[in-house]
């Protein structure tokens, strides 16, 4: 389960591009807290602290307690916008959540036991279709990552959501199909060799036809 994080914030009186630019010049990131049947709350947070939490790797699927005005607001990060050139955060959105809330989050996947995959041992390539899974779970039970065991998978095999064992209390947000997460594909050298073989066989057949 992801650790709970804390962000100290201050309220901001003005919105708009001019006010936001001024905040960024002072090392602050404008943000908004919304949801929970309450009015949106405009805040700003320290850029360095936000960057530090983003670098944990699980910020977007962690409960973040925002401390502002002497109280704490329980939230889930929903979006962080970055400057297209400087790669610095320029805005953040947070969703208010109740303590017993059920949330939908994107959780990264990791692949295990690659040395036990016949396809990968033969030089196959793990083609990842989904780097994250959309999951539904309690806010206090968000996984850091989902481990996927590739033991026994061969070249040409696909790994579907039905092949994945999710933690207790965690479900896939997509329930209408058995979607693909990854496939094991043949290496380029093997594909090329197969193609040459097919080509040779075709030429042989054509020559045989001429002789007839």
Swiss-Prot record:
Q: Which cysteines are joined by disulfide bonds?
A: none
The UniProt GO MF terms for this protein read: 5S rRNA binding; structural constituent of ribosome
- Keyword list, A-Z: Ribonucleoprotein, Ribosomal protein, RNA-binding, rRNA-binding
Q: Where is the composition biased (Basic and acidic residues)?
A: 10-23
Q: Name one GO biological process term.
A: translation
Q: Which GO terms describe its cellular component?
A: cytosolic large ribosomal subunit
Instruction: Give the highest taxon in the source lineage.
Output: Bacteria
Compositional bias annotation for Acidic residues: 201-212
Q: Which Gene3D superfamilies match?
A: Ribosomal protein L25, beta domain, Ribosomal Protein L25, Chain P
Q: Which parts of this chain are annotated as the region Disordered?
A: 1-23, 190-212
The answer to whether the entry has keyword ATP-binding is: no
Q: How does it assemble?
A: Part of the 50S ribosomal subunit; part of the 5S rRNA/L5/L18/L25 subcomplex. Contacts the 5S rRNA. Binds to the 5S rRNA independently of L5 and L18.
Which NCBIfam families does the entry link to? bL25_bact_ctc, PRK05618.1-2, PRK05943.1
PANTHER family associated with the record: RIBOSOMAL PROTEIN L25/GLN-TRNA SYNTHETASE, ANTI-CODON-BINDING DOMAIN-CONTAINING PROTEIN, RIBOSOMAL PROTEIN L25_GLN-TRNA SYNTHETASE, ANTI-CODON-BINDING DOMAIN-CONTAINING PROTEIN
**Family of this protein:** Belongs to the bacterial ribosomal protein bL25 family. CTC subfamily.
Protein function: This is one of the proteins that binds to the 5S RNA in the ribosome where it forms part of the central protuberance.
Q: What is this protein called?
A: Large ribosomal subunit protein bL25
The protein's organism comes out as: Sphingopyxis alaskensis (strain DSM 13593 / LMG 18877 / RB2256)
Give the gene name: rplY
